[in-house]
Amino acid sequence: MYKRQIQNIIDSVGSKGAVKFLGKVYNNISLDITKSIILTSDVNTTLNGKLNTYVLNIKADDVLVKNLNINGNNGSGIVVNNVKNTVIENNNINNLLNQSNMDNYNSGITLLPGKGIALLNSKNTTVENNNIQYYYNGIYLNGAKYTSIQKNTITKNNFGVEFDKDASNTLINNNNIIENIGFNTMVMIEGPYGYGISMRHSGVNVTVTNNRINNNYMGVFIDAKNCSGIVITGNEISNSTIEGLTVNENYTYAPGAVLIVENNAIYNNAKGPSQIILGEVSANPNGIYGPGEWNDTLKLQLGPNWYGTNKYTTWGLNQTGPGTICPRIHTTLIPYNITCISPGKYEVTFYNNGSIASKLPDLTTYFVLNYNTDKEEVVEVVAHQGKATFEFSAKNYNETNNIIEGFSVFDPNRPKSVIYTYNVPESEIPK
């Protein structure tokens, strides 16, 4: 079936009707949706886009797009254009790329084309449970208001979610925003690509909660003027090439506004390679918090977070990398402690101001018994709601002088740093 035939079918369906694709694959597709309808499939239909344009252009209110494979062809997947009440759910939204350029795309040498989902002056849009990859923007907001972005996997784009001008009232919840592609080389200091979430041109009433924002060039980037109502809580932000979170030089806030960043696990960032490696979070020295490096009252104030360390360390000339904090920021550490449950078995508990840090996201840490000896044993621990249990094999204990050490990262390709040491009493050695 040709594009024109499909367009004619869509145009002939009454408002509030449905178009169900029955075929497996349709090629050279670029469709305009000008009435309130449902587009769906029960047979895993693939719509391969026309070269250098959109696959679907939604120009009517109350449109539902679900259960489709939507492949842009060096262009965009779905454009939502000046309408309201659009729902985009349970789709795979990919980009058909020139395979000869894949190495350049993955390294960031060549920028990716198109937008997976472009929200242009839209209102009340729901984007849920989609897989979006290999676009310049996974999700792009320009003039979009009251947008819900939940339960998506957004990966291998130049920007996972990007805020352009006049976007507001956005919920970004429970997404996997991972491996978004920047200049992962020694060429660039910071960006301008590869950000998990980029609030470059607007940041008004944005809630970022319970997401996994991992393995991006940078995790979260805030650079907009006159920001207000930004809340970043309960996220795992880890393994970024440079910082996990940056407040950049153009950032300003509206009168009375407070940037809330708390109960996140922001750790194991600044992994490189990059021209400059800093730490977990940063405030640009040329921005409004620049003087905070020398005046504590002028620092950016962040709430308590897990930074992959039990010791507050400000980065400096001789101290950068994972676990370090920008000197223009004041924050509070969420540390952990371990206690013995029974011989050989332990519980790790993270604490926020003396109470269990139950609002933390799930996070990974490591404990090593008798590190760097012939009885070394490594356990990977995933903490849930601020707690986890772990145990070591009895055969790896010495009769005396056993030590448990904690590491935020235990990767042969990354430097290791002990963040916790526990001398095991003889009463805790399993028999």
Listing of model-derived features with the role each one plays in the protein:
Residues 14, 33-35, 42, 51, ...:
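Parallel beta-helix/beta-solenoid
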Residues 410-429:
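Edge beta-strands of extracellular beta-sandwich domains
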Residues 29-33, 53-59, 76-82, 99-104, ...:
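Glycine-rich beta-solenoid repeat tracts in large extracellular/virion proteins
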Residues 7, 16-38, 42-52, 287:
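N-terminal extracellular ligand-recognition/capping segment immediately after the signal peptide
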Residues 37-79, 87-112:
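Right-handed parallel beta-helix/beta-spiral solenoid domain characteristic of secreted/periplasmic
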Residues 350-385:
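Short flexible loop/turn segments that cap and initiate beta-strands
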Residues 68, 91, 130, 152, ...:
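Consensus "Asn ladder" position of solenoid repeat domains
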